[in-house]
Amino acid sequence: MPRFTTLTPEQLEYVRTFFLMWGRLLIPKLVPGAHVVVASNPLLSYIVSGALADAGLERRGEIVRLTMTMRGGDRPKSAHEDFPEVSVMPRSMWEPWVVYRKPIEGRVQDNLRKWGTGGFRRPSRDKPFGDVILSAPTRATERRLAPHPSLKPQAFLRQLVRAVLPMGKGVVLDPFAGAGSTLAAAEAVGYKSIGVEKDEHFFDMACEAIPKLVQLTPDVNR
């Protein structure tokens, strides 16, 4: 939803209840130490995060997608000339992805040996995975292949998806697959993945778009 959308208390409670129930349903399907990463926005991330904590997952921080969008920064509606130096709210220049983990069994090293989970895969031995990822808006090339309203760029997703399987083994699950961009990123970095999408239109779009998105060579500096 647009970042500036104002939700009623009842709608906010619906969001909280949805992610609480979703988290509870998800936990039995996860191996110990598996990470859950959920894209959000600065206005709703606290609700999503609190619901996942209440569901029984443990908070492990946030991934910040550092990007400028077209949302926010506007002057007061119908009073632009009266308040030319005022922005109603900050223009969005980042996107929070909340990070949670199913509790591990014993120590991290024990969990890694048994389940292959519990941490994040480093970009290299000398460089840890960081919680800020520079990212340009999704390129027009990708949007033409997969015209989904919330399509994320491959340059960003491939870095994130690669990191969530610390041993490079396992299955990436996207329960809100949309046009398949996360699944394409998993395929591109050599991971197995499963996607779930209830919208038939977007399901068909994903079936067509995933092979094409996999073939893209994204600019990782974007």
What do the predicted segments below correspond to?
Residues M1-R222:
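S-adenosyl-L-methionine-dependent nucleic acid methyltransferase catalytic domains
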